Amino acid sequence: MTTNRLVLSGTVCKVPIRKVSPAGIPHCQFVLEHRSQQQEAGLSRQAWCRMPVIASGQLLQVLTHSITVGSRLTVSGFISCHQGRNGLNKLVLHAEQIELIDSGD
C-alpha cells in the first residue's frame, strides 16, 4: 500500500519555528490543535489531538509567513515518524497544502 494522506483543520497552538536547512531549504514547524465532534458506531464523540506540522520549501513559506498562534488552518499532506531528542517517536504531518480559514472578522 502506498496511500498516505491526512487532512486536518485546527488552530496553531505553539509559536511557529522557522529554519533554513544546510541545503538552503526553508522549513516552518508548528503545532496544530484539532477539536471536533465525530460520529462513531452511531454515537457522537469528541475528537481532539495536537499534531506537529512541518512545511518545507519556498512555495509554502509564502503561506506560513503570516501564521501565528491562534491562526485557523486546514493542512493537507502526508504523515511520517520523527524521532525526538528524547528518543521517542512521534507522528508529524508534512504539509503539502495549507489553507487559512477565514475567522469572519
UniProtKB/Swiss-Prot annotation:
One of the protein's GO biological processes: DNA replication, synthesis of primer
Ranges of residues in domain SSB: 1-102
PROSITE patterns per the UniProt record, alphabetical: SSB (PS50935)
Sample GO molecular function, one term: single-stranded DNA binding
Pfam families for this protein: SSB_1 (PF22657)
InterPro entries: NA-bd_OB-fold, Primosome_PriB/ssb, Prisomal_replication_PriB
Keyword field: DNA replication, DNA-binding, Primosome
GO cellular component terms, A-Z: primosome complex
SUBUNIT field: Homodimer. Interacts with PriA and DnaT. Component of the replication restart primosome. Primosome assembly occurs via a 'hand-off' mechanism. PriA binds to replication forks, subsequently PriB then DnaT bind; DnaT then displaces ssDNA to generate the helicase loading substrate.
Family note: Belongs to the PriB family.
Entries under HAMAP family matching the protein: PriB
Stated role: Involved in the restart of stalled replication forks, which reloads the replicative helicase on sites other than the origin of replication; the PriA-PriB pathway is the major replication restart pathway. During primosome assembly it facilitates complex formation between PriA and DnaT on DNA; stabilizes PriA on DNA. Stimulates the DNA unwinding activity of PriA helicase.
Protein name (database record): Replication restart protein PriB
Organism: Photorhabdus laumondii subsp. laumondii (strain DSM 15139 / CIP 105565 / TT01) (Photorhabdus luminescens subsp. laumondii)
Encoding gene, per UniProt annotation: priB
